[in-house]
């Protein structure tokens, strides 16, 4: 699922369109399709990751305001007690942001800001990105070959 705002961000920051990501996707859902499978608790999945997660999306999830498929799927993920990982990237954070993130954390949501780790001495943006992807995958219980653990 990619929101219209997500599509703009993808293009502005990466020069990519949603079609460019389809090689890694099985299904593409429209953000306005509230009747899609991820909107139902009976749809089996391991969990949900929102990357990047805007503070608007954080606010919507916190308040249960499910006006698009991402917000509804996150709401269902929380109610079904499945893993929800939000890769937030706002900086600096306001008190409102922190309150919303705290509230979600209290619900068991994993807040994972894409913080650069220097202990592995990254030499490229690709290595920094790989480390962040590794952290996300690790939280989902999945292995990522480019993730260097602390030794």
Feature map (PLM): residue ranges:
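A cross-family phosphate/adenosyl-ligand binding-site feature
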Residues: 1-85, 91-151
